[in-house]
Every structure is written in C-alpha cells, then in structure tokens.
C-alpha cells in the first residue's frame, strides 16, 4: 500500500528519484497517468489493469465516460526505474502537473500521487477542511469492531449505514 509523503526534485530531463520502499511496491514498474487534481498517478501494473477493466465496462456513448477514458488513457505511459531508482516523466505529463524543481510524492492507497510542491502546499487547506473530511469519512465505517465488539480484528471497511 502506498502511504506517506516524500519530498524530492525533478531534474531537467524529467526524472524523479522514487524512494526504495515505494519502488519495492513496483517491482515490474507501473503505469503513470494524469491525476484528477493537476497531479500524476503512478499505479502498479496489476492495479492499472484492474482499473482499465472496470473503466472499459462503462459505455462509450456517454460524453463524461469518453472524457474519463481520454483523461486516464491518452496520457498514460509505462513507468520503469533506471539503475538508481528514477522514473522518467514525459514532457506532456510534466506540463499537465506543472512539475519542475520540488515535487511531492504522496501515498494514496493503491497508487502514488506525484505533485508539484507548490500545488501540494496549495491543496493543504482543502485536506485540512474538517467539514469535508467528515463527509468523506462518513462514507466508510471506521469503527473497526468485530461481531463480538472487540477492536482486535482486521478492519472491515465497508459502506457506513445511512440511518
């Protein structure tokens, strides 16, 4: 699982060093594509292939679905690491995410986000918004209780009841 934040730089050739603990999650490389917030998303191959399967089940007759297809797939590239653990970001993806100089790598569960440091800092207020966070967390059950009421079982994250 991709968790945590890392601060690095992108060099003039578009290469970003990815920490070894994150590279360990991507032994075969992955797929790099546009994110939804002027960032990039780096997926493990198996997760991107699952995403592709799910997205391609959507009908292409709806304009919003075609927009999603284009957003995710037209800019996607395979991502491989060089000998010293850097991933190459093509110019059009650097432009999309406004990457130059300082960058932030942010874990997002089953993928890694790559942000310009300035965009990441600008979005800090939104991430800290307690009202929005409350609404998002209301979508899942964070009680983590087992049937017997003990809190020592593995979490069962599912939709929260809407009573």
Language-model regions: role of each:
Residues 1-8, 12, 22-78, 83-84, ...:
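Flexible "stalk/tail and boundary" regions
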